[in-house]
Design a protein with these regions (language model features):
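Active-site metal-binding motif and surrounding structural segment of the metallo-beta-lactamase
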Residues: 127-175, 190, 259-262
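Flexible, acidic/histidine-containing loops and adjacent segments that form or flank the divalent-metal
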Residues: 192, 199-221, 225
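Cap/insert and terminal regions of metallo-dependent hydrolase folds
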Residues: 22-23, 27-43, 138, 147, ...
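Active-site environment of divalent metal-dependent phosphoester hydrolases
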Residues: 154-158, 180-182, 198-201, 216-218, ...
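Divalent metal-coordination and catalytic microenvironments
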Residues: 105, 115, 152, 159, ...
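Helix-loop-beta element that forms the nucleotide-linked donor phosphate-binding surface
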Residues: 183-195
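Metallo-beta-lactamase
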Residues: 4-12, 16-141, 234-245
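Active-site-proximal loop/helix segments of hydrolase catalytic cores
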Residues: 161, 216-262
Length: 262
């Protein structure tokens, strides 16, 4: 009986050691930006974010009142001209800035939209920071979209009102790890979560690669860095376009420049 107990104890210890080693090996295989608790972090050697900084709407609004918030009339292109220009260029390649981080990029037969935000406010409530100017187009005025790129989950980039009301839910969605649920829940059928350096070939001329950025993610008090963030490299017919996430500086950009900018 004593020998039987010893055998059980030894087996338990062996199982524990094997499990521990398996977990260790699994984590060793994961890239640096994957943290063991399931969150993400910036590329190795990136500047550290100051976690002691506290955001305050009171301070923000106080400082904002000191600024001249008047937008020069010539800064905003008239709606008629925007629609006219897009109509003239419908058979050409173009990049159109809609506002903030929202661009419409037409390359061949593929039309891309980036971080579309058509709401008046950026935040979980209607009282979030308000945009200075309206987007160049309304959501129901944009051309047919084939490819939807999302860099990260901050409210001024991942706008749930726009995602829910987006008129082209058959578009291919490309976005960081762990953000797909926001789209599948809202009727999108072609949702592709991507890790850094993942690439997807759209057609013979067009390829999209998801690249590292020096940033972070957060939409609530409890989800800091639980979803990934990043940049998109758009390669089309020998040309390269980098659509950058909100990003700080970091050594990673020297590496990306050396490896991707050729």
């Amino acid at each position: 009986m004593a020998n039987g107990k010893k055998l059980i104890i030894i087996l338990c210890l062996l199982i524990g050691i094997t499990s521990y080693n398996h977990i260790g090996l699994t984590m060793e295989k994961k890239p640096y930006h994957h943290v063991s608790d399931g969150t993400f972090r910036n590329p190795e050697g990136s500047p550290e974010r100051n976690t002691n900084f506290k955001w305050s709407y009171k301070v923000f609004n106080k400082e904002k009142k000191k600024l001249d918030m008047t937008v020069p009339e010539e800064h905003v292109v008239k709606k008629e001209k925007v629609l006219s220009d897009l109509s003239k260029l419908k058979n050409d390649d173009y990049i159109a800035w809609i506002g903030h981080a929202t661009f419409i990029i037409k390359l061949g037969n593929t039309t891309i939209i980036t971080d579309p935000v058509f709401s008046k406010n950026a935040g979980p409530l209607i009282f979030g920071p308000k945009r200075f100017t309206e987007p160049a187009l309304k959501l129901n005025e944009i051309p047919k979209i084939d490819l939807f790129l999302l860099t990260h989950n901050h409210y001024d980039h991942q706008d749930m009102m726009t995602i829910r009301r987006f008129p082209f839910k058959d578009a291919k969605v490309m976005l960081p790890l762990k953000l797909g649920k926001y789209f599948t829940r809202n009727g999108y059928r072609d949702v592709n979560e991507m890790d850094w350096y993942d690439e997807i070939k759209i057609n013979e001329k067009l390829k999209i690669t998801f690249l590292p950025a020096v940033h972070w993610s957060k939409r609530s008090l409890t989800d800091t860095n639980k979803t990934l963030w990043g940049n998109f490299l758009i390669e089309y017919d020998g040309k390269k376009i980098l659509f950058a996430c909100d990003t700080g500086v970091g050594n990673i950009y020297k590496d990306l420049g050396n490896n991707m900018a050729q």
